[in-house]
Amino acid sequence: MVERTAVFPAGRHSLYAEHRYSAAIRSGDLLFVSGQVGSREDGTPEPDFQQQVRLAFDNLHATLAAAGCTFDDIIDVTSFHTDPENQFEDIMTVKNEIYSAPPYPNWTAVGVTW
């Protein structure tokens, strides 16, 4: 069996320990990353939606960096949206700043109700 190694970004380990999950798991050459949200360092939600998207990507970046990875290493993204029609522009603005040149990752966006 392949060894699994838990990965945690600096400063947020208590959040994961409290809820009993890992920010990411490295297994062989693969990194499996838990879902990321636009929360502040203390875990509270950011009220401004575009800033919330930025924080989610910042949190993802921190997790990737803790594993020695970058956004260029991502091959597949699944995102969940509570109001896609009104959120799409803000999401695309931030996404396009991060992924500004090919090859782009696969991306599946799913509209959900909460």
Could you describe each region identified by the protein language model?
Residues 1-58, 62-75, 81-114:
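N-terminal presequence-like segments and the immediate start of the first folded domain
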